[in-house]
Regions:
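A short glycine-rich, Lys/Arg-flanked "PGG" loop and its adjoining helix->strand segment in the class I
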Residues: 116-128
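Short alpha-helix
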Residues: 161-177
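Class I SAM-dependent methyltransferase SAM/SAH-binding core
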Residues: 38-40, 44-92
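Conserved beta-strand signature within the Rossmann-like core of class I S-adenosyl-L-methionine
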Residues: 129-137
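A short acidic, Gly/Pro-enriched loop at the edge of an enzyme's catalytic core
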Residues: 88-103
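Core SAM-dependent methyltransferase catalytic element
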Residues: 178, 185-218
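Conserved alpha-helix/loop element of class I SAM-dependent methyltransferases that forms part
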Residues: 16-36, 46-50
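A short SAM/SAH-binding and catalytic strip from SAM-dependent methyltransferases
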Residues: 101-115
């Protein structure tokens, strides 16, 4: 299993994880990152090219998969970013509270055990009014698609490092104490609907007066 996890899975993610519709959304939301950035689940490093090096001082990367880290380091060398890969000892993020300007998560919250507690930990390291940028997939709004998601979830969990396609990501983000201030959603081609319903947007750790929701075309 370690061979698949570290030698096969990272290349599978690199091959499948960034088709044009997804890449275009990365290009839109990741330049919003600024200051000290914490990215959870760096994957193969496809986000690096979308950070603005004139706005981002440093990127801390949490990635438990050594195979992913090797691919991400190849991408890091192509940028002008200052990047530090950090370990996750236990469940405690090894950064001081209130020190991070931006937290980034792309296609990671579906895999984390105890995801609400993990999100609370991310909220703690954010500075007051720091920003959480997310781009995730999960539970579709259509009942017929949800049925297929529940049937397919065991396969997703096996093939994609514990991926849960039945998670309601906005609800989990809110449960952790974040306030979503911008969100868009929709099915993203070319993947089947059982795995392609996504949300992308931003949230803050303190309550805001309002939020706006935009429905993307399906």
């Amino acid at each position: 299993m370690n061979f698949y996890r570290e030698r096969v899975y990272p290349h599978l993610v690199r091959a499948l994880g960034n088709p044009k519709p997804i890449a275009e959304i990365r290009q839109r939301i990741l330049p919003l990152a600024q200051g000290e950035v914490l990215e959870i689940g760096v994957g193969s490093g496809v986000n690096f090219e979308h950070y603005d090096p004139t706005r981002v001082h440093k990127v801390y990367e949490l990635e438990p998969n050594r195979g992913m880290m090797r691919l991400a380091d190849e991408q890091r060398l192509k940028t002008r970013l200052q990047v530090e890969f950090i370990d996750l000892p236990g469940e405690q993020i090894p950064l001081a509270d209130g020190t991070i300007d931006t937290v980034v998560s792309t296609f990671t919250l579906c895999t984390i055990p105890g995801v609400v507690d993990a999100l609370k930990g991310l909220r703690k390291v954010l500075k007051p009014q720091g920003k959480f940028i997310f781009f995730e997939h999960g539970l579709a709004p259509d009942a017929s698609v949800q049925q297929w998601q529940r049937r397919a979830e065991p396969l997703f969990r096996w093939a994609f490092e514990g991926c849960h396609v039945t998670r309601d990501i906005p609800r989990l983000i809110s449960e952790a104490g974040f306030k979503i201030d911008m969100i868009e959603n929709g099915y993203l081609a070319p993947f089947p609907k059982s795995g392609s319903y996504c949300w992308w947007g931003t949230a803050v750790g303190e309550l805001l007066e309002d939020s706006r929701v935009i429905q993307a075309s399906s």
